[in-house]
Amino acid sequence: MATSKPTISTSFLYETLEETLDIKPLGAKLHIGIPKETAFQENRIALSPEAVGVLVSNGNEVSIEHLAGEGSHYSDADYSEAGARIVFDRHEIYKCPILVKSAPIVSEDLPLLQLNQIIISPIHYSALQQADIQKMMEKKIT
């Protein structure tokens, strides 16, 4: 009795590989502002110099307020080397269309906010006054 070996199809040996495509930018460049946190004992900063470097290398513009990273032991030189623009005027930072903060917006910041501005930060509704929320809604803050 002759026994024959089963044949194994070679199609099981191939794996599908992902193809990496060159993604072209859509032309929309973001201008992101990082203000210095003023809350009591707030030492965090929203973006590290490494994160700023990634944003800048992807064609975006990042502005950071002077000494914003000192509580997290990042110097202005660290951010400048990563490609950020150091801004010495708090009012100028708040003119950026996108703000990134590690602490919530406080009442003192509301007059500085611009129309249709995007703010990426925590928000504590229980700590906000209804008038503050109304001002943010009037300015169409997202």
Where are these regions (language model features)?
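Structural/interface elements that position substrates and couple domains in central-metabolism enzymes
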Residues: 2-134, 138
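Glycine-rich loop-to-alpha-helix module at the N-terminal edge of alpha/beta enzyme cores
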Residues: 142
